[in-house]
């Protein structure tokens, strides 16, 4: 049903242009992001449970359709996700993390990061897991360590704990200097530029 809703909004001409822009063979429907966001908001309202959203997001991601993957990320992009029982928002975090090895381009990587960053801020102890990504051989997983942690670069008045987290992330950035991959360098400059705007 969710895929049917996305397909009704398909725009083949827009899809062709988007495929060329993103340089991808992945199926694209040509649905603008604001329309995807509106659909995701509606689905979230229909079933606000973590289990329901995680199940739908997982199914959408597995279609491999570009807009379906954007919608999957949008379903899990909110500051507060109240989970049932002791697991809390862990299923949402685990799902987003499971997407990392399947990422193959910056656009979907950034949508996944929007969802993941909120879960990371909700539970900063997950930085332990994120640190492991800095040693990954997979470009988009390694890049995710910087992009998921951007909220710490945006803080205007960081607490002592957040300053420690910021220093930790900056140490990862320092370790990326030797990596000549363009997307890695761009993620570092993005982080530093964001930080300098608030903490020159």
Predicted regions span which residues?
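Alpha-helical scaffold domains
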Residues: 1-200
């Amino acid at each position: 049903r969710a895929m049917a809703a996305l397909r009704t909004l398909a725009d083949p001409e827009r899809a062709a242009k988007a495929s060329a822009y993103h340089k991808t063979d992945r199926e694209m429907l040509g649905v603008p992001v604001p329309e995807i966001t509106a659909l995701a908001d509606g689905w979230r309202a229909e079933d606000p449970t973590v289990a329901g959203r995680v199940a739908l997001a997982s199914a959408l991601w597995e279609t491999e359709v570009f807009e379906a993957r954007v919608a999957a990320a949008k379903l899990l992009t909110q500051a507060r996700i109240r989970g049932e029982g002791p697991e809390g928002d862990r299923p949402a975090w685990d799902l987003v993390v499971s997407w990392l090895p399947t990422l193959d381009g910056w656009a979907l990587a950034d949508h996944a990061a929007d969802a993941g960053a909120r879960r990371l801020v909700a539970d900063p102890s997950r930085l332990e897991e994120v640190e492991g990504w800095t040693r990954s051989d997979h470009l988009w997983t390694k890049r995710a360590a910087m992009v998921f942690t951007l909220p710490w670069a945006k803080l205007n008045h960081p607490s002592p704990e957040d300053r420690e987290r910021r220093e930790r992330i900056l140490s990862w950035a320092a370790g990326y200097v030797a990596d000549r991959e363009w997307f890695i360098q761009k993620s570092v400059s993005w982080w530093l530029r964001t930080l300098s705007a608030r903490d020159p």
